[in-house]
Design a protein with these regions (language model features):
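Long, low-complexity, largely intrinsically disordered segments
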Residues: 1-149
């Protein structure tokens, strides 16, 4: 199994069959209104104040219907700042704490520079400059990681 996250759009899981075809299961789709509603229902998931913020969670709902529950799949995407590693390092993990309800963790030093830009919902405001003053090398790495997300 492999997971693909297109940040701000969708999370998908795919299986490559023996014939080379891919079976794609959508684990969730991002919708700002659904994310804000999810934060209201789960206040402990709201971003901490900027001074103490080390991670944020985003809600991706309305995924493929789960065969076992009959409900749409959903995923919490946890973006976590980690330090002491190469700027280009990224760690990913996928958990399924409940049937067809997932947690996709994304941990990277790049996230550290994004956290101060986020609003009270943990989202990047439309007018925010995504890349604060960084060297050209850092900007390339950030863009590559954003493309992977």
């Amino acid at each position: 199994m492999n997971e693909i996250i297109c940040y701000g759009k969708s999370v998908e899981q795919y299986h490559v069959e023996k014939d080379g075809s891919r079976l794609v299961v959508r684990l969730g789709t991002f919708d700002r209104a659904a994310h804000v509603e999810w934060l209201q229902k789960h206040p402990h998931k709201r971003p901490k104040p900027q001074a103490s913020r080390t991670h944020v969670s985003h809600f991706y709902g309305a995924g493929s219907i789960c065969d076992k529950t009959g409900q749409p799949r959903e995923t919490e995407v946890k973006l976590k700042c980690v330090t002491g590693q190469s700027l280009s390092s990224v760690s990913l993990y996928l958990l399924e704490p409940h049937t067809c309800q997932y947690i996709l963790g994304v941990e990277s030093p790049v996230i550290c520079s994004l956290l101060p830009l986020l609003d009270e919902h943990g989202l990047v405001p439309a007018d925010a400059q995504i890349l604060p003053e960084k060297s050209a090398d850092e900007e390339i790495v950030i863009n590559e990681i954003k493309d992977e997300l």
